[in-house]
Amino acid sequence: MSASHNLSLFFESLDLSKERLELLLEAFYPMLKAAFCISLPLAIISFILGLFIAVFVALIKIAPPKHFVHKALLAGVNFYVSLIRGTPLLVQIVVVFYGLPALGVYMDPIPAGIIAFSFNVGAYASETLRASFLSVPKDQWDSSLSLGLNYLQTFWHVIFFQALKVATPSLSNTFISLFKETSLASVVTIAEVFRIAQQKANASYDFLPIYLEAALIYWLFCLVLEAVQKRVEKILN
């Protein structure tokens, strides 16, 4: 089959008849609603929880090992980061939702998705935060400790917000990627944008236009998120 014939078939599949336009309009609102009510909140909640995990992991990694407990924690967080970064997010979601019930742990799709996304974000963001914490000059740590502040007080009052400014661009990109990756939650029946698109496409057998419509919604949201990212970076700078 020639390339020109394939191209012709592609444009024929995009033929916007009245019936197809009605179908696209009918599918657009549920997908847009899912983006606002499911995908975006899922990304926000998972990102916030993931940041808490990331801060904890980064602190363990940058703290000087002084005793057995810290060394054990360091080994644990290194294993966690390696495991999460070395396995696909889709597999992690499936393991949490379908695998944990084998151990007697049952949960609804949305909590399962939040847990999987949060731990994924935590592993990746921890490396970003660790690098940003280490970017703060060491003499600021030493000066604060010499003034009587303990390790956590020094971190919170002196280091954290300086490091956050450095980490903001990378963390913003992580959040935008996370929003797109919420489409993977469709495998555990969470009714986010892509799940709605699948349902509409399966019902109408008109796959390409509806999937392109879903892609358009993701793209528009990402454009808005990128604009917010640039605004935040401008304020911080």
For each predicted feature, which ranges?
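Transmembrane alpha-helices and adjacent helix-loop boundaries
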Residues: M1-N237
